[in-house]
Amino acid sequence: MSIEKVYDYFHNYDSKVYQIFACMGNEPSEKDILNFEKQYDISLPDDFKEFTMSPLGGLYMEVREELWPRAKVYDVAPFWTFCRGIMVYGIAKGIPDYLDIRVKTKELHDEGLEDYIPFFSIIGDGNTIFCFDKNNRIVALDWYFKVAFEEDEMNFSDFLLKKIKELEERKMQMIETLENRKN
């Protein structure tokens, strides 16, 4: 199962490159997940539920500041240079609002976008949020235009691994960009 590949990645990730926060120790129970599903009359994908109930649920993963400095107010740069991390929303007790799937779902539904359950976003991209639609397909939802675009057909685990790979590619590009500025 591809969720094992996700766990393998995080067992071996480079902690000198990424800082990672997750619910570790505050994992939600199966009952917490069922209550959320019942509230929104949905059934979340099994691999997402497993991930959410693991110590990695409510994941915040960001390239360390020393390697990829945060943008300053009024910085002008290519869009990708602002996208220095990822977040997977969770249901853990005491989870910050910006990582809480319940808070994010309420925000989305209050905007009239009730056919979607948000579960993922890229740090630095305030317009796009990734959601499960009513059929558990993964869609990229543009907050501004309120339009959903279907992602490639894949499960949550493969999607997460793809987004981590894209983050690693951006990190390498940023390191190269910063090196070129020094020379």
Regions found by a protein language model. Name each.
Residues 65-66, 132-137:
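Short, surface-exposed, charged loop/turn segments at secondary-structure junctions
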Residues 149-169:
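Compact, glycine/acidic-enriched structural inserts
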Residues 166-182:
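Acidic, carboxylate-rich catalytic segments that either coordinate divalent cations
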Residues 1-124, 181:
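A surface-exposed partner-binding patch
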